[in-house]
Amino acid sequence: MKWFNLKNYSFLFVMALAVAACGSDDNDSQGGSGEGQKEPNVNRNTAYTDAAATRIEVPHLQEGNSRFIVYRTNDKTFDKDGVNYCVEWDKDLKANRWSCYILTSRNVQGNEQRWSGGYADYYRSYRETETSKKSVYFFDLTNLSLDDYYHYDDNGATHCYIHKAKGFDHGHLCNSNDRTYNSGNGVGEINKQTFYLTNMQPQYSAFNGSQKVNGKNSGIWLTMEKFVNSFPKSNKFAANDTLFVCKGGTIDRADQILTRIDGKLIVPKYFYAALVWKRTNSNIYSGIAFWFEHTSVNHGSDALKGYAISISELEKKLGNKIDFFCNLPDNIEKKVEKTAATLDFGL
């Protein structure tokens, strides 16, 4: 009988397990889902009514009176679950906590025009120069009630508190320009959904870029938006890569609230963006975050790199209230949140 060296075979078996543990099956193709992963993940979303809560771009959901809202379309060309973007809305604070979505080299392309209003299937809100019954920004009354918003009535219409007369613009979180691909249903539904008031925060025009400097729109938030939109179009970004995006404003701490419009609607003192880039072919992840003070002074010409921080630092600035990218396996999440990968992102 031939005897085998069990010690050597045990060593090979342990090595095989170690090699297997270096990879991760996070199953995020065309939709960012974190389901199916084999690596430990103790802080992932487990209490939810919509499976979209397991997507990589979705932070850990808050308890209490917060509502997780998923905006979908019937088109699954760019997302296997038809997810456009997701929102967490705090019904007590009556404010958006964050909006999150994915960008790929495919869904960032398109020629869909910016939504300009005119459909009667949405609840009419305020438009600064509007004289007709067309509208641009909408209350989502499918997922929320009108009482879940701060609103007021005037001239037979219900309005939100974000408008120039109050000193602020509608600040998109899921950017309209990030949703220009056509859903094929003929009404631009994908872009139109970004105009829900659940996806808005009040922003100074000098901050969000509606202010013009030397004839061009300028603002540090716009600078960040352009960077996020252009990155999946760059040579760095491969066809199967995914950029996971989460943006928001500070609403949870009194010292991080700039003011309240008419004593009601929160105006964040800071805004942020958190990004994770997955190179699908090599299963490599890179992370970066941006932190901006919300000010009426125009900083549109500033270098974006000066606002870059790690995702871990962003979480600390937010008082650890938000756990970003919690659906990533713990080992990947820890590594990707540790440093701001400015070189990887070309900053």
PLM feature segments, named:
Residues G23-L347:
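Domain-level detector for secreted/extracellular nuclease and nuclease-toxin modules, and
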Residues A18-A21:
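C-terminal motif of bacterial Sec signal peptides marking the signal peptidase cleavage site
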Residues M1-F11:
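Bacterial N-terminal signal peptides that target proteins for export
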